[in-house]
């Protein structure tokens, strides 16, 4: 089952930004319980040039269904607001 998601932001604090950890909101997932079922699944982002960057969902973020995904390499800023595929 493949799910689409939107890249919301980098994982960050007031002074630090973790470029290889992204906050992703899967579409049609609205609770922490539903999001926890996605932990361990693969996340794919396709760049405009066709390169595919892979990540893995590592934990839930908040109570509205967002998740954190750790990528092998950090995603570029142009990925913000773009769609990813959760496999």
UniProtKB/Swiss-Prot annotation:
Set out the biological process GO terms recorded for this chain's protein.
translation
Keyword Cell division appears in the UniProt entry: no
Q: Name one GO molecular function term.
A: structural constituent of ribosome
Keyword Ribosomal protein among UniProt keywords: yes
GO CC term (a single one): ribonucleoprotein complex
Annotated S-S bridges: none
- What keywords would UniProt list here? Ribonucleoprotein, Ribosomal protein
Kindly name one Pfam family recorded for this protein.
Ribosomal_L35Ae
Q: Which SUPFAM superfamilies match?
A: Translation proteins (SSF50447)
HAMAP family from the entry? Ribosomal_eL33
Q: What is said about its interaction partners and assembly? A: Part of the 50S ribosomal subunit.
Return the similarity comment: Belongs to the eukaryotic ribosomal protein eL33 family.
What protein name is recorded for this chain?
Answer: Large ribosomal subunit protein eL33
Q: Which organism is it from?
A: Pyrococcus furiosus (strain ATCC 43587 / DSM 3638 / JCM 8422 / Vc1)
